[in-house]
Amino acid sequence: HYFGAIPTRVMAFMKDLEYECLKLGIPVKTRHNEVAPNQFELAPVYEEANLANDHNQLLMTIMDKIARRHQFRVLLHEKPFKGINGSGKHNNWSLGTDTGVNLFGTGKTASENLQFITFLVNAVSAVYKYNGLLKASIMSATNAHRLGANEAPPAIISAFLGSQVSACLLYTSDAA
């Protein structure tokens, strides 16, 4: 049951995993049940792309190691069972310059906010316009088994902006 109580054995595994991640400098958050039976979520916190890739590889290795200590097995396949939700393998990303400027970061001045809005609108437009190309470049064959609706993995690529950014864009469009 989504967001239900996590079974005691699983909670012990997750706490051990989070502790190992902390010791290794892998920033993680989120701990909850997923929709599919015996599926649980742990989310790495965003960081610089190369470091995030290294941390994801290390995370998958230690997940397997700690799972075995708890007499579990970890399935990292996107859709291990036909017709049952799998891992959506969400990908959250941002863009930055070589000097560390976050191009999707809001600013303190009108020109800094204009930069944010410009990059945001173009990124969302690209997700809409090049949806098929994005899917072809990021979906493995096994992650292409879509269930549709709100089931993981979904049949769509979406851009969730949150209420504050959505309100900012609405205000900007109304002011124009």
Locate the predicted segments by residue.
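Carboxylate/His-rich catalytic cores and anion/metal-binding grooves
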Residues: 1-25
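A short glycine-rich, hydrophobically flanked beta-strand micro-motif that places a catalytic Asp/Glu
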Residues: 30-33, 73-81
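Short, conserved phosphate-binding/catalytic loop or strand-edge motifs used
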Residues: 34-42, 87-89
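Short, hydrophobic beta-strand segments
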Residues: 39-49, 93
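Helical (often loop-to-helix) elements that flank the catalytic cores of nucleotide-handling enzymes
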Residues: 51-68, 95-127
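Flexible glycine/proline-rich, aromatic-decorated loop/lid segments
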Residues: 83, 87-99
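Polar, glycine-rich mid-to-C-terminal structural blocks
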Residues: 118, 126-170
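Conserved small/polar residues in nucleotide/adenosyl-binding loops
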Residues: 171-176
